[in-house]
């Protein structure tokens, strides 16, 4: 019997993870909202690059990567930038943690889909 996938649990947890924990926000934002907004802006920028500057970028791929770019935060939450980038050594360690979470998220998919999503979820592959 195939192993059960928990991938959707990772993704559907995104609205529960709040961003900007140390900042006052008029309207609290979660990583699902953030990822959606980033996907829209990224898609538009790719279209502009192609139409105005003779680019050769796939806007759909750019938008897809943007939708998943914070998936690892469903494991450890949103780490605030002043902490994450306090110095180069700390930043490297946080990137390692994010990589482990990205791999865990990827491993939550059935094996037959992992090759497709590896290039979307694992930041080192993007």
Question: Residues of each region from the PLM?
Answer:
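Divalent-cation-assisted or electrostatically stabilized phosphate/pyrophosphate-binding catalytic cores
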Residues: 86-102
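Membrane-helix exit/interface motif
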Residues: 46-50, 72-83, 109-118
């Amino acid at each position: 019997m195939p192993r059960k996938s928990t991938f959707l649990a990772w993704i559907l947890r995104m609205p529960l993870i709040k961003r900007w924990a140390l900042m006052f926000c008029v309207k609290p934002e979660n990583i699902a909202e953030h990822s959606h907004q980033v996907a829209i802006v990224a898609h538009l920028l790719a279209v502009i690059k192609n139409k105005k500057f003779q680019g050769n970028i796939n806007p759909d791929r750019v938008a897809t990567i943007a939708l998943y770019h914070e998936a690892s935060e469903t494991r450890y939450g949103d780490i605030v930038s002043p902490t994450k980038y306090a110095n180069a050594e700390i930043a490297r360690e946080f990137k390692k943690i994010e990589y482990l979470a990205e791999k865990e998220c990827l491993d939550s998919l059935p094996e037959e889909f992992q090759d497709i999503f590896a290039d979307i979820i694992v930041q080192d592959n993007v």
